[in-house]
Every structure is written in C-alpha cells, then in structure tokens.
Amino acid sequence: MNFTLARFVFQFAVSLDTASTRSNCKYLLLTSKKRKFTTAAIPLTHTSSEELLVVVGGGAAGVYGAIRAKTVAPKLNVVIIEKGKPLSKVKISGGGRCNVTNGHCADKMILAGHYPRGHKEFRGSFFSLHGPMDTMSWFSDHGVELKTEDDGRVFPVSDSSSSVIDCLLTEAKHRGVAPSVVLQTGKVVTTASSDNAGRKFLLKVEKRTMNLVECIEADYLLIASGSSQQGHRLAAQLGHSIVDPVPSLFTFKIADSQLTELSGVSFPKVVAKLKLENVQRSSPYLTQVGPMLVTHWGLSGPVILRLSAWGARYLFSSCYKGMLTVDFVPDLHIEDMQSILSQHKIRFAKQKVLNSCPPEFCLVKRFWKYILGREGLSGDTLWASVSNNSLISIARLLKHCTLEVAGKGQFKDEFVTAGGVPLSEISLNTMESKIHPRLFFAGEVLNVDGVTGGFNFQNAWSGGYIAGTSIGKLSNDATLKNRGF
C-alpha cells in the first residue's frame, strides 16, 4: 500500500488541504474482533530527510513548536495529532479576543514572578530565548497587528482570536518546502514507547470515531497536550513522574448571602489576603492587589484569580475552605478614614447614612448598604445618631472585612491547572527530556502555570519555540551526519 509521508496517513478536517508526498512503505494489517490495527514496517534505508516529528496536541504550544521546527529544518516531516479542534483554547481566551501575551514584562525576573509554578526556574534562560517581545514581533511579522492595553495585556487589533488562529494555521500549512506541517484531528495518541535502541518512538494512535488504531514510528516527539490526562499518561509511559494536577485560576464561593446579592458590583482596587488552616506561615503570595468583582456565588476578578493560582495546592488540600480578608479602601490609612467619617458625620448630621457615603471611599450605594448592615445600622439612621464607636467599626470593617471562602466557583471555570511533568526533569534551554533523548515538552503539560494577563500563553509560545528550535537543529545535524559532513 502507498501511504503519505512514509509512515502515516494525514487527515485534517478543519480548513487546511491535505498535504502529502508519496513513498512506498510496507504496512501489515492485523485484525481483531473489536479493533483494526495497522502496523508500519519501516524501511531501514530511509534517510534523514524522512525524519518525523510527531506533536501531541494542537494547541498554542504544539502548533507554534511545529512551525518553528519546520522553519529550522524545512525537510523535517511534521505532524500534529489533536483529538479535538486545533487551537480551541486560543479561540475562547480573553473572551474570544485572545490575550496573546503581556507587554509590560520585558524584564525576565519580573516576568517569572507571574508564574506560581515556574517562578524560580524561569529566572534563567527560558524567556531570554523567546520572550514577550519576540512573540509580539513574530505575530506582527506574520500579519497580526497587535495592541497593548493599559494593564499590559496584548490583543490583536481586530479583537478577535480568529486573527491569531488563522495566522498560525496558515503558517503551519505553508511553512517550508513540501511536505508542510500537517494537522491530524479527531485522533488520540494512546501509548508511547521506544524501540530497543532508544532512537525511535513507537506510538499508537486511535481514531475517535472509528475502531481503528494506527501505529506510527517517530524520530522526535513533542508532547504539548495541555493539562489533559493524555499527555501525562504518555510522559509517564516514557519514564517521567507527574505532579498531580489541581485546578488553578478559579473564583471563590463565599458563604455570605447578603454579599452575593450584590452581584455585578466591582472594585477597581482592593487588597485581599487569604488565610488557610493548613498554611502555618504567612506567604507573601497569598496577599494580592487588584480589581475584584462580586458574583452571584461569591467573588471573582484578577485579585481572586491570582490568589487561587498562588494558593492552588493549599486550597485543594483544605477542600477550598479558608478566610479572606479584604481592604476595600487600600489607599487610605484607618486613622484617615476615621477622621473622614467624623467630619462627614458633622457635615451631614441630618442626612440618612444610606444616602450619604463619604466620597473619598469610592463605594457604590449597594455595597455601602451592605457595610452598614454588617454593622447593624439601618439605612434610615441619621448621621447625627451614629456613635463614635460605630464610626471606628465602619472604618475597621472597610479595612479588614473578613469573608468565609466556602469553595471554588460553582462552574467549571478554571482555565488552567497546576501540575504535570516536573520542570526538574527537562532542560529549559532546549525543552528536551533529561530522561529520554529526543522527547520534548511545551506548555501546560509541564508543572507550570501563570496568573491572568497573557502569561500562560507566553509560556506556551516560549516553550514551543525553544522545543521547535532544538528539534530542528537536531534534525539538521542528523542530515549533515548522514551526508558525511
């Protein structure tokens, strides 16, 4: 039988044409009652130009890495195997706008500090090899015009993730000489092993809609399957350990029905501190500053998401129970607040407290009513009737408002997980496994996760680029060696 690219059949059911070259290979069809297997017998005389890179996962890291490998080594055969739709997370990120990276972190030390898992390791060469500015230049050079918003988040000017997706898929299709990078969807790599010499990867690929298993022999393997169990399973089969994954970047469920009735109320800046029973010593990372939003189940917003990321494992082990202390007026000292309240009481003595909140506090009326209620004050109470002790209590409550965290947000809204292949088991300057040569990792399959703001995608771009570069160089070296250079 004739098969494309010497060792496998390519199918891509999204928007790309099938790219193929012909070469003769012997395949042995083995049938069983339940499944049909195809086993490839690879000719021993194949040349380095026939080397194959299989990328497991058609997300940001996988596609970017495949493109880079093909750029460095144009004759390298590259196939991406994705069980679903390629770049699906890119499509929905940033509310469909795609937060490509963060443009306010040119310094690698500052950038590394945005990764709860990875902040120590990323202080090295990782972002020096391919950082946010490199990512922005790459997309700009490939026709995606970008903009940087006030908080540093970088989006396509089109405000549509389709601009990023179209760019990546087009580049994957046209990159280098034939054959191009090929995407194979609707299939899952179920097992991975190596041959006796440890030079080849033997992969079994199952088609999701058919009882069919294909056997593929690859020279290089890049696992970039995100946080799915598939990637962790393959890594374990090839000798790697796995840090158990737990949710990161999620909202908090708050045990306060009066607060949740304020759904939609937002605060541009609060200081939130998370206290957990299983954390004996205070961690600076469990105190965060930023915007916060009240939801109908609790709290959300960047400050909460950052707390959930830094406290991901602590929260998991405590069954997502803890105490949250919020400073709603972080730019004012408590003594100044008490003085403001005392002066406000004198000035507006005959007004109802609900109708007259000190403007210095910048609080909406609905939340001001909530604060008064927690202090046992009726909104109809006149300012003249408010005791000095009550004024002190109001100031303290606004500076140290305690809220009980009762669990994660009720929806499966975590977008990122903590856990995966330990960074200690790979070389970050190449993304190659320290355990198995020619095995590479990139993206969320590793025990790396970032906070919101484009940092998780930057991890994907950087890891994919470094891995692709390393694979391409190895392939080129093999080509020169086979030619006698």
Where are these regions (language model features)?
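Glycine-rich FAD pyrophosphate-binding loop
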Residues: 54, 70-95
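Beta1/beta-strand and adjacent pyrophosphate-binding region of the FAD-binding site
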Residues: 44-61
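A conserved short coil-to-beta-strand element within the FAD-binding core of flavoproteins
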Residues: 180-199
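Core beta-strand elements of the Rossmann-like FAD/NAD(P) dinucleotide-binding domain
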Residues: 49-51, 209-220, 287-288
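A conserved FAD-binding loop/helix module that cradles the flavin
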Residues: 220, 224-238, 447-479
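Conserved N-terminal/central alpha/beta ligand/cofactor-binding core
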Residues: 83, 88-178, 294
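Short hydrophobic core segments
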Residues: 54-56, 214-227, 235-236, 292-295
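Residue-level recognition of phosphate/Mg2+-coordinating polar/acidic sites
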Residues: 106-109, 128, 133-152, 204-206, ...
